[in-house]
Amino acid sequence: MKSPFFLLFILLLGVALRGGTPIPHAMNQWPMASGPHGTWATTTEDEIPVRWSVSNDSNILWKRVLPEGGQSGIAIWNDRVFFTTNKPLREDTSLEETEGSDIIGYCLNAENGNVEWTVDIPSPKTMPYSGLFSDNSSATPITDGKHVWFINHGGLMLCHDMNGKEVWRRSFESRTRHNAKQCEPILVNDQVLFVTMRDSDDPLRRSMRAKPWARNTAPELWPWTFIRSFDAGTGKALWTGESGTSVHNTPRMGYVGGKAVVFHARGGGHRPPEIPYGFSMSRVSEEDAGRELWNHQSDRAVTYTVSHFDEYFAYGLDSGSLIKLDARSGEVVRDIPLFEKADIHLWNATTKQYEKHLDASFSIVTDRFKKEPTNQTPILTGKYYLFMTHEGHCVGRVNTESGKVEYLQVPVQVVRKQGVADRVLWDQHISSDGTNSRGMKTANDRRSRRDGWGHVTAGSPIAVNEFVFFSTMIGMTYVIDSQKTVFDESALISVNDLGQAGRTWSLSTPSYSQGRIFHRGLKQIVCIGSKRS
């Protein structure tokens, strides 16, 4: 019997997707980072694994050790799994030299994790491995069940058939002002959408007047980055967005008025050159593809998020508020302060119980905090907008209809060892050593030893039915029931691990397909769930 939530969610999803779906026959697949609908969410009647432990080998169907780490998410189509890693380093490589330009695309068997084929994906741009905000392997592959597309952020797109035969390749220039490259490629209407600069021979491209890698030079000296469209079958460039898009932003596609659109943003840290800062909704198809529907300007826009919206409203973060915009016009419908007045459920370390604080300021959690989320962690599921806070280790939930704000504090880490009781850490963590499967340290940024909240590009969350999966750099995955009437401790379904505390590191997004969760860290990729009957 279908649950009332499932029926309601299907109804809401049908409204949201009234214009169609981006990839035919993808309902039970996970064809790109943002899932079958491009929304980072899906519904299912299949089993949803919500509890597991790689440390204890609990609810793990298979594990595949990887020769080198990487940061991409995982695309799945039937019995095929696609992802990328960095090219394996020589074993005598020092920590200071853990960088490279090339990555490797993988195709695994979804039933047992066996390697079906791999492909080398070179590029001209060298990047540090295991970067705190991205590396060359960060883009998740996309697939439609007939082809798979891989992107090396350093400057190369590849299209292969499902057997590994190359169909086409296309080079592009990767800007060197920022290491961060947050865009996840999108497949919609036989187009691959990706954020990059115009080609060097494009007369509309702004001239490059800064020296490469001179990141502190004036932003106006640099060319802009845009959402660009490429023919999925040939790699031919189709159109370039009317307005720029920041490298910090993860654009999201959807449908407004039955038409495919993409919501994107400009702004962020280290002065991105694309101006004016703010949020835009742009067309994806037909004769006006790339043209803006509207542009909402804001000098204080928080852009290092997935840009979520539905058919009626779009959501942006701005100076400690969630801004609710009309999806058709961009007009501000509501400004919801996030940190001034909220119901906050905090863990009391003395009483070992949760305490509820009504209509409280977030300052009761911590007196020093940034009014923004952990990078890339917001998600929209039904009427609720959820995110991981920058400080305080709380999951925030906003009712976008009523404006009610709630916070639930969660453990920083759960340490598990076979035969030993779990150790729950609330205000400290065991730092990851940042090693790959060969025991080589590859995470050279000292901030890589932090707990994975705050100033880091976390793997973006996904939603499967009511369950939201949030992941952190130290290998924790929180499963949250997003639809609980009261957002208290009952909404924390589980805290799961991707491996041993202190030896696990991940900035990847999980994926769901046909009753299984797929996830990864530097050392291995895992399939979570049970064998099919």
Positions of predicted regions on the chain:
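Positively charged n-region of N-terminal signal peptides that target proteins for export
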Residues: 1-5
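Bacterial N-terminal signal peptides
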Residues: 6-16
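Noncatalytic, solvent-exposed loop/strand surfaces
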Residues: 20-533
